[in-house]
Amino acid sequence: MIDTLQARLDEVEAHAAHQDKAVDDLNAVILDQREELDRLTRRVNVMLTRLEALEAAAPGPEVTKPPHY
């Protein structure tokens, strides 16, 4: 019976070790994705700033009536 309990304990410890490794791996992926998301957010903000500057500098559309009026 002691051998059976030891075998079960060893199996549980092995599963726990694999789960710890999986959690660590997933955490690393999440951190990488967070960094990528932050980088992309900064790039989008830069592009929005540039677009707003271009829109402010561009002449507005002419206000004319359509030809059918």
UniProtKB/Swiss-Prot annotation:
Domain of life (superkingdom): Bacteria
TM ranges: none
InterPro entries, per database record: SlyX
Pfam families to which the protein is assigned, alphabetical: SlyX
Sequence similarity: Belongs to the SlyX family.
Name assigned to this protein: Protein SlyX homolog
Naturally occurring in which organism (per UniProt): Maricaulis maris (strain MCS10) (Caulobacter maris)
